[in-house]
Amino acid sequence: MTNIRKTHPLAKIINNSLIDLPAPSNISAWWNFGSLLGICLILQILTGLFLAMHYTPDTTTAFSSVAHICRDVNYGWIIRYMHANGASMFFICLYMHVGRGLYYGSYTFTETWNIGIILLLTIMATAFMGYVLPWGQMSFWGATVITNLLSAIPYIGTDLVQWIWGGFSVDKATLTRFFAFHFILPFMVSALVAVHLLFLHETGSNNPSGIPSNSDKIPFHPYYTIKDILGALLLIMILLLLALFSPDLLGDPDNYTPANPLSTPPHIKPEWYFLFAYAILRSIPNKLGGVLALMLSILILAIIPLLHTSKQRGMMFRPISQCLFWLLVADLLTLTWIGGQPVEHPYIIIGQLASILYFTILLVLMPIISIIENSILKW
């Protein structure tokens, strides 16, 4: 009799995705982040569900409902901090996953890559709206500043902002709709993840060498299931260390002050995972220009496949491109640091130079260096 996992309509899908899936024999730990992102998503949905049971999306009670979760709900504190720090772990895994795609040329799977960009944008939107919900000072002013950026859109800008706010300022209507969207978006993310995997399984995984691995495949289970479990244990261990020992390490102290429309915090800044984009936004003195640069800093990923000029797929055998890639990583870390600093000399000029370098590396240097490497190898 044939095994039920190979015949049952539902079990068959799981079997072909997680058990009998042919996988390259040489994929490294950089290929672990996909499964880690899946674990992060499940964790966030579960902790978020339990938080939503006790949270009230109302300007008068939102802040105190979060305090109530931490003080009065059984294990509410750990659920809240797992959710808050889970978002940070989510973005660490996301950036590593995207970085891996850039380094090893995984973006040549254009459908998978494009769905990945949509996923990234959706997750960023979800995280932004989630940050507004505790209704602390940074929640309120972060929401005000970021939504206000849309007013830079010519002609319809102001109307658009007021439409999103549901009034003339960030208020009760804004909080309620942000809660509704924050709840629904992770399920949309889950659906997009299924599409992401669907496209990936059409082609199979890339591997560090960038050479087709059809002649040397191994079953996903047990080799990569055990490898994924190791990654998951490390992820959960780091998350628990964060949540239990220093839960507020990555947060902003201002968010422990209830939202007050009459007092602006001295330094308005988003969560650490948005600081690089925030630094790019602030580098341009013009409002519309800043908003465009902010959008392009993420959307530039969409044209990366068009800028691939190398005859090789990944960077494994391209040392000059490797140097450029790590320069890009250092540049992004610099931007992250600048995003958290006040707008004053020397931070302004450092941010501007780092922003220019970011776009120059991706749009100019990478394609040119790839062509030079081709000629060095006489290809």
UniProtKB/Swiss-Prot annotation:
Keywords: Electron transport, Heme, Iron, Membrane, Metal-binding, Mitochondrion, Mitochondrion inner membrane, Respiratory chain, Transmembrane, Transmembrane helix, Transport, Ubiquinone
Location(s), subcellular: Mitochondrion inner membrane
GO cellular component, one term: respiratory chain complex III
Transmembrane feature ranges: 33-53, 77-98, 113-133, 178-198, 226-246, 288-308, 320-340, 347-367
GO process terms (BP): mitochondrial electron transport, ubiquinol to cytochrome c
Annotated heme b b566 binding sites: 97, 196
Cofactor: heme b
Binding, heme b b562: 83, 182
The family this protein is said to belong to: Belongs to the cytochrome b family.
Subunit description: The cytochrome bc1 complex contains 11 subunits: 3 respiratory subunits (MT-CYB, CYC1 and UQCRFS1), 2 core proteins (UQCRC1 and UQCRC2) and 6 low-molecular weight proteins (UQCRH/QCR6, UQCRB/QCR7, UQCRQ/QCR8, UQCR10/QCR9, UQCR11/QCR10 and a cleavage product of UQCRFS1). This cytochrome bc1 complex then forms a dimer.
Name of the molecule in the record: Cytochrome b
Lineage of producing organism: Eukaryota, Metazoa, Chordata, Craniata, Vertebrata
